[in-house]
């Protein structure tokens, strides 16, 4: 479980493509100080398992299903990724509960910058529409955000300068692909309401 508060930006340094999975190595400096092999790390909002690590880098693997559901296939050497360690139950929660189970990817439709915020508009599938509500929570590339606008086929989030500076949102451009995870509470409520 995660909170959607990005702790570090990592850099992809190698990608090894195998028949049934891809192996990624991520440079992360001091981020790895208290981790061990087998720990869970959210990478762009995807719950991954550390399969190997050294002082300043770690490796994780993604199977075909993960590659299909996320933006991992779009990563390349030098790409920046958002990182977060799994929460401990005695820690303060500043964002919202993020499971690291990406529901789908969305395409950046529009980016509008001003001094106080950056508004990013993202495509929305018919299947995700029931879980996306004005002022509700959503995870985009592992970042806990509040939905600022919803339309039939897209939604928008507003990014403050601090978030823009400390996440890979600063690298986003139109038509880029991002990982989307619906708020788990919204999903469970929808299940309760629609189940007879």
Where are the regions a protein language model picked out?
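Conserved loop->alpha-helix
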Residues: 1-196
